Amino acid sequence: MTASQDFVVKDISLADWGRKELDIAETEMPGLMAAREEFGKSQPLKGARISGSLHMTIQTAVLIETLKVLGAEVRWASCNIFSTQDHAAAAIAATGTPVFAVKGETLEEYWTYTDQIFQWPDGEPSNMILDDGGDATMYILIGARAEAGEDVLSNPQSEEEEVLFAQIKKRMAATPGFFTKQRAAIKGVTEETTTGVNRLYQLQKKGLLPFPAINVNDSVTKSKFDNKYGCKESLVDGIRRGTDVMMAGKVAVVCGYGDVGKGSAQSLAGAGARVKVTEVDPICALQAAMDGFEVVTLDDAASTADIVVTTTGNKDVITIDHMRKMKDMCIVGNIGHFDNEIQVAALRNLKWTNVKPQVDLIEFPDGKRLILLSEGRLLNLGNATGHPSFVMSASFTNQVLGQIELFTRTDAYKNEVYVLPKHLDEKVARLHLDKLGAKLTVLSEEQAAYIGVTPQGPFKSEHYRY
């Protein structure tokens, strides 16, 4: 990257290919295209300086261009070292949008690129964050605490934290006061995924959230669609591209039965696998059992599994002891946001053979081997291309509405975590019905009055679970 080249991509010559796929994706993303039509003239994001940290895919490229059509300035990095589609990054960089994303980044590159989304040419700060997993948000908040004299950088708990803390120290030395100034300038953050939302709620509980946040993940049109139907298609896609294994008849264990786990279990069952589920939550466990899945512990199931996938958002779900029990050539992967669901660090002293990008064969001293996908990071994005465009349109339309809401109505929000109101959730769903040829029934005035709603909605209470 030079002063005249404010981007880092693998190969800018891939831009034409990326543009062709981007044009196709637009036809599958009616929510984002409707947002351009509705808000393009009014420019509600004019003046917004958005730092985006979200998988740099073709679908994300459509989101970025939508934000720009609505008036925003944007700088972008991927939120995962393996999830970038290099042709998508090139297509966006070729339009003049600063993007810092390469498939297969080192951790050092990842945190350098995260830093770059806050480095505007005029030296002024960002005023909005669009996040997926919370890394961009945490980068600023941890840095600001360090500048305030708190001892937050001296005891890293992982290799990732070592690299993160080193990058924070580097920026503090280069630009004193940077993090404090940047934190004060943020009007709000919109967060895409369960893991990042959990981080925000923890900050709120401790009184450490310095700006409002919108929890996009828990919009119904995100969690019940992206998390479930998206994983239902992309999980098996990633396993197939990574291994070419036939799943029919295999024993697959899905760790977790939240929305992502439900989609993952259905994905594997649809491919013919015999699916078992592990759960800590009795409600989710009962759902799994009544959906026809055997509910087991991983301690019991590890030795018979052909495929094991984590979906929980928690850490140490698959331990080194579990992996020692697994059969030869068991496939191990994760579709939760971070790589700590699997104790990958405990495997580093074993023999690793790279089969192809994001596929590693790991050999134990007794000769038993495991196939690890994407080094324990998101296999649907590392080994494949993530969720289909249509389902991401719903998620990303929520992101656009959240950005507009926080940027234009900042004073209406306290420094807390919010969910988009029901009428906007229903609006997002409505925008996607025509593409599927679906026709809504319309309540009469009498019917609406009988159940206490209007014929236009909202049709459900805020606590309705769907």
Curated annotation (Swiss-Prot):
NAD(+) binds at residues 193-195, 227, 256-261, 279, 314, 335-337, 380. One of its GO terms (cellular component) is cytosol. The keyword Cytoplasm applies. GO terms for molecular function: adenosylhomocysteinase activity. It catalyses: S-adenosyl-L-homocysteine + H2O = L-homocysteine + adenosine. GO terms for biological process: L-homocysteine biosynthetic process; one-carbon metabolic process; S-adenosylmethionine cycle. It holds the Pfam family AdoHcyase_NAD. Its cofactor is NAD(+). Belongs to the adenosylhomocysteinase family. May play a key role in the regulation of the intracellular concentration of adenosylhomocysteine. This is Adenosylhomocysteinase. The lineage of its organism: Bacteria, Pseudomonadati, Pseudomonadota, Alphaproteobacteria, Hyphomicrobiales.
